């Protein structure tokens, strides 16, 4: 049977949504693991990751049920939501890949000033204090404060990894963006195909 057939379209759509389900569970698991082992203390960051995971899980569930049952309404809404997610994710991925070092520094500084718990995590894990300079009046949880060694600012250390992280996130985002547009195309084809097991006189 050619891959344009009903069964092949159904199987491909089910496999794609199973992939999204695994990714969503992985996101939720990583967030829970990070806060469980004390690597992340920011409830805002964990909440965002878990919310994205749950949202992706619900989308995958709608797509999976729609594909198995060949449900026209579910497939329609799944296709629309997936298209909107593709537009947002593709835009964010391109922005991640297009940021230069100066823009990365400005973005990191904004995040540094607005998230106290994440700032404390960075200072503790990277053993640094302050963003661009060390202020002795600020609270710092880095171990270098208790030792005789002087603490370094965090901006140069974060800057070493920021570009690589943004390229990695942008690349992964682009990959999943193309899987989403593939999902939209598969859903459109599958939705307009007739189930060979259905009653030939039934209305699609």
Curated annotation (Swiss-Prot):
GO biological process: regulation of calcium ion transmembrane transport
Cellular location(s): Membrane
Membrane-crossing residue ranges in chain numbering: 20-40, 45-65, 73-93, 168-188
Bilayer disposition of the protein: Multi-pass membrane protein
Keywords of the record: Glycoprotein, Membrane, Phosphoprotein, Transmembrane, Transmembrane helix
Pfam family, one: Tetraspanin
Coiled-coil ranges (or none): none
A GO MF term: calcium channel regulator activity
Ranges of the Extracellular topological domain: 41-44, 94-167
Family matches, as InterPro entries: Tetraspanin/Peripherin, Tetraspanin_animals
Residue numbers carrying Phosphoserine: 143
Residues the record marks as carrying a glycan: 113, 137
One Gene Ontology term, aspect cellular component: plasma membrane
Cytoplasmic membrane side: 1-19, 66-72, 189-204
Family label: Belongs to the tetraspanin (TM4SF) family.
PANTHER family for the chain: TETRASPANIN (PTHR19282), TETRASPANIN-13 (PTHR19282:SF203)
Protein name per UniProt: Tetraspanin-13
Lineage: Eukaryota, Metazoa, Chordata, Craniata, Vertebrata
